[in-house]
Amino acid sequence: MNILVVCQHYWPEPFNTSDVCEELVKRGHSVTVLTGLPNTGMLNSDIPDEYRNGKNRVQKRNGVTILRANLAPRKTGAANRVKNYLSFWYNADKLARNIKDEFDVVLGYQFSPVMQVDPGLVYAKKHHKKMLLYCFDLWPISLTAGGFSQESL
């Protein structure tokens, strides 16, 4: 099966998304991941030099093809976190609209916020494909961790 996985976080970020995708490859599937630039878990929650200025936007690792959308680095503070989420959403949506490959199914691998998987919906609707959502929704806890007060929710 030819699978498109959409998740804001992928290797080298410290999330298990890469483990799942690599296991799917070991089981005989073709996997492409639409993801963002690494920044969560990186030094100062910033984008590493090897991903700046348009570098490494398409990669192949352990059989998985990786397509990277631009995004604002996570850094610290609630405003930066919101910019990070919105920039991935916007840029990955643009990328999803232009993917030429035909995938059999889309897997939305979503931590939070839920809009992370919208690029998968964009692709699935355009190409009339099924989409599976694997959701680890942490809202509103992720907002309080990002600096929003409990009273503001």
Predicted regions, residues:
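N-terminal subdomain of nucleotide-sugar transferases
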Residues: M1-G54, V58-Q59
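Hydrophobic/aromatic beta-strand patches that form the interior of the parallel beta-sheet core
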Residues: L4, T32-L34, L67, L107, ...
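Acceptor-binding helix/loop patch of EC 2.4 sugar-transfer enzymes
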Residues: Q8, P73-N80, H127-L153
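An aromatic- and histidine-rich active-site surface loop
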Residues: P14, Y85-D93, V105-K129, L133-S142
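Short, glycine/charged-enriched secondary-structure capping and boundary segments
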Residues: S18-C21, D46-D49, V82, G120-A124, ...
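Anion (oxyanion) recognition and catalysis
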Residues: V25, K60, L121, K125
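A conserved catalytic-core segment of Leloir-type glycosyltransferases
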Residues: T35-N98
